[in-house]
Swiss-Prot record:
One of two assembly initiator proteins, it binds directly to the 5'-end of the 23S rRNA, where it nucleates assembly of the 50S subunit. One of the proteins that surrounds the polypeptide exit tunnel on the outside of the subunit. The gene is rplX. This is Large ribosomal subunit protein uL24. The lineage of its organism: Bacteria, Pseudomonadati, Pseudomonadota, Gammaproteobacteria, Lysobacterales. InterPro entries: KOW, Rib_uL2_dom2, Ribosomal_uL24, Ribosomal_uL24_KOW, Translation_prot_SH3-like_sf. One of its GO terms (molecular function) is rRNA binding. GO terms for cellular component: ribonucleoprotein complex; ribosome. Transmembrane segments: none annotated. Keywords: Ribonucleoprotein, Ribosomal protein, RNA-binding, rRNA-binding. It comes from the Bacteria. Part of the 50S ribosomal subunit. It comes from Xanthomonas oryzae pv. oryzae (strain KACC10331 / KXO85). GO terms for biological process: translation.
Length: 105
């Protein structure tokens, strides 16, 4: 099945410590997404001179389950659910469920 959320989509987070935050999808891994500047975690890394990596505390984005984000509708500015509409030529088109407005051109 095709994913309702793709890389580059503007999304809003529904649950968790970052509830209400908006950001762009950086990566989609199956049923998990990474959203820019959301769900930040700290990783303690060892220095590795061979790879040129300095040690220390690194802050980066962690993944969020795909069910915990909604795509932002540019017309309303709110997060809304997305469904699919099958065109006559067999292609699938992502549409907002509330308005039926097409998400992809």
């Amino acid at each position: 099945m095709a994913n309702r959320i793709k890389k580059g989509d503007q999304v809003v987070i529904n649950t968790g410590k970052d509830k209400g935050k908006q950001g762009e999808v950086v990566r989609v891994d199956g049923d998990r997404v990474i959203v820019s500047n959301a769900n930040l975690i700290k990783r303690h890394t060892k220095p590795n001179p061979q790879a040129g990596v300095a040690g220390g505390v690194v802050e980066r984005e962690a993944s969020i389950h795909i069910s915990n984000v909604n795509i932002v509708n540019p017309a309303t500015g709110k997060g809304e659910r997305v469904g699919f509409k099958v065109l006559e030529d067999g292609r699938k088109l992502r549409v907002f469920r509330s308005s039926g407005e097409a998400l992809d051109a």
